[in-house]
Structures are given as C-alpha cells and as structure tokens.
Amino acid sequence: MAVNLSRNGPALQEAYVRVVTEKSPTDWALFTYEGNSNDIRVAGTGEGGLEELVEELNSGKVMYAFCRVKDPNSGLPKFVLINWTGEGVNDVRKGACANHVSTMANFLKGAHVTINARAEEDVEPECIMEKVAKASGANYSFHKESSCFQDVGPQAPVGSVYQKTNAVSEIKRVGKDNFWAKAEKEEENRRLEEKRRAEEEKQRLEEERRERELQEAARREQRYQEQHRSAGPPSPSSRTGELEQEVVSRSRQEWESAGQQAPHPREIFKQKERAMSTTSVSSSQPGKLRSPFLQKQFTQPEASYGREPTSPVSRPAAGVCEELAPSTPPSAQTDDEPTYEVPSEQETLYEEPPPVQQPGAGSGHIDNYMQSQDLSGQGLCARALYDYQAADDTEISFDPENLITGIEVIDEGWWRGYGPDGHFGMFPANYVELIE
C-alpha cells in the first residue's frame, strides 16, 4: 500500500522547509509512521546536528531523517537523507515500507547523500561526514580562498633545456640496443633451425616407413612364393584359371549368339534362387524318382566330357548358369540305369557316356586335377586371401584363410559357393585363390 503524506501534509512541509532554510536554527527533522498505518507524521526536530539526531532514532520503528550539515571541504551546506529501519522491525513491515523509500525521497528533495541504515554503526557522525566529504568532489575551502592579487615579484629567467651529450652513456645505450637486436636475431635463427630439423626428422621417418613397407612387401611376396613352391608346381592353377576364363567367355558367347545381353552375376544368382524355390516335384513313373540335382549333373553335352571336365553349360533360354560340377570317373558311370530321371520339362535321361578319348598331355593334367576334386567331395575349392563382408543376403562373408567349397564360376569377376558358415552365395573372385 502507498505511503500517505496528505493527512499530516502541512506539518510535514513545515518541518522540511525549516531544515532547508539556511538561516533557520533547525538543522534536522525526523519522520515516522502513525502506529501500523502508512500515514507519515513528524517525530521531532532539533538544532543539535547529527549527534542529537542519532539519539532520537528508535530501533523498533521505520523512520526517515533529513539533516543539514556543513561540507568539511568547501564549508557549504549539504543535506543528508537517512532511511532508518530498526533491527526490531518485523520482516512483513520491512517489506511494506521498502516501497515507500522512493516516495519519501521525492518529498524530501535536495539530498546530497542518502544513507540506508539498520544499526547505530551506520549513522555515526564521523562516517556520515566522511561520505559527505567524498560526495562534494572538491578539496578546497570556499571561505578561505582570497580574491586579492598578490605580487610575488619578478620571476627568474627560464633555464635552457639543453643537456650535454655524455659519450659514455650514449655508447652504453647504443650497445644495449645492439645487444637486444642481436638476441632477437639469434632467437629467430634458432627457431628457423628447429623448424628445419623438424622437417628433416619428418622426412627421415617417412623414408624409414617406406623402406619398412617395401621390406614387408618383399617378405610377403617371398612367403607367398615359398608356399606355392611347397604346394607344388603352379601349372595346374594357371591352367585352371585359363579354363575359368574359357568357361566365362563361352557363357557370354552363348548369350550373344542367342541375341541377349549377358546378365550381371547378381541377377543370375537371384534368378536361379527363384527358379529353385518355385520348382516342385512332379509326378514320376513307378519305381523312378525325378531329381533336379541329377538334371544339373547328367544333362551335360557328351562332347564336354572329352574337352572340358570342369566346364559349366550356360543355358540362355532358362536365364541362369548351370553349376560347375566335377566330372564323374568312368568307373563310377558303368553302373546300371539310375533310378532318377530329370523333370518333365527336360526329358533327357542320363545315359552312360561314350568312352572318353585319350586326351593330350595338357588335358591329362586337367583330368587328374578334376578327379582329385571329385575324390574330395567338395567340388571346386578356394582359400580366402582377404576378408570380405556380404553386402546383402545373396553374398557370403569370409575371413582370410577360410575355405570356400562348391564354387561355381558364373562370371569373370564374381563366383559363388559355400562359405565357412554353410551359406551359399556370391563373392568376388579376386579375393580368393584356388586350391590345387
């Protein structure tokens, strides 16, 4: 609630005017509240200065004091406003009266120093006069200054500012300047030398790193050569690579002769998976079974047995490449008629192939190599040189030194086979090497 100055307005104004009047003997006035209301009344006035005013302050009330003092520096009158909040006042009253400070300051205008006091130590006359002296901003006595002119007599002639040069001190100063210039130059040279040495050290470390890499590459190459020499002559692997290239090129030629563009290996694999998933077992004759597995093994052209034991037959019309299956030894093919026959869409039954003609010296090695693969029962196998992570579910993952079995050469850059986890999928051909 706002403070009320109108109820006792004439008495308040009269006390204030008596203090601000310079010729009036009254030099202080004290104001307080009427009971617990917000009405301001005059608590007292006096002529005894700050010492008398301090004695009238009550520690259980909120009071406002306005006092006239003399500036100790200039001797001019100064006015001091004291906002007194006693230590015995409750917190609720303190909060309510805190909003009245600005209103009382507007009413008691002209104060040079405002002091917010809570204890007697805050209103000691010495402390108040010290604050008044600091607030004046001038260290002179207005009444002590004399306005009369005083003749102090003739002034002495002004001396010259010339100073004789001291050679010794000049030499020392110049020498000192040269010393610091030399020190700065040496410091700059030292930084350049450190930078040059750091560059040389960096180049030396780079050269050592290159040499270590070359030596490690040479040792890896040497170990690779030793492994190949210990495994046997490299001719079968080279001939196997030639056979793989021939298989891939023949597959592409068959696609081109059929007027179609060779599909990507990934598309071939997906089409083959779809074809195998949609193939169902059809009705068969009594005493015979139909097997897609025997279809893939026994429908090879007869000419392929004598020429390329590992050559897969590409079927452009079906849209997929047949698996690369090792040829069966002639002794195993002289049994009775098999109890399996191919599905109805391919009615060609397995028949005993004609006797294999005697191949040349080069093809003999290939036959021996493929027969060794047949005996292993794993098909075409390879060892991983690097690690590879599958990009999707149509590929397989493997680590270095893992074995990949049942490999089918479906493209020059992509093969497919069974990974170490048994999953069948594609993988890059340059990540593996065939096992001789």
UniProtKB/Swiss-Prot annotation:
Q: Which GO terms describe its molecular function?
A: actin binding; actin filament binding; protein domain specific binding; structural constituent of postsynaptic actin cytoskeleton
| N6-acetyllysine sites (modified residues) | K176, K296
> Which GO terms fall under biological process for this protein?
adaptive immune response; endocytosis; neuron projection morphogenesis; podosome assembly; positive regulation of axon extension; positive regulation of dendritic spine morphogenesis; postsynaptic actin cytoskeleton organization; Rac protein signal transduction
Q: Where is this site: Cleavage?
A: D367, N368
- Please note every region of biased composition (Basic and acidic residues): 185-229, 264-275
Identify residues that carry Phosphothreonine: T26, T299
Q: Does the keyword Cell inner membrane apply?
A: no
Q: How does it sit in the membrane?
A: Peripheral membrane protein
Q: Where is the SH3 domain?
A: 377-436
Domain of life, source organism: Eukaryota
Q: Which GO terms describe its cellular component?
A: anchoring junction; cell cortex; clathrin-coated vesicle membrane; cortical actin cytoskeleton; cytoplasm; cytosol; dendrite; early endosome
Q: This chain belongs to which protein, by name?
A: Drebrin-like protein
Encoding gene (name): Dbnl
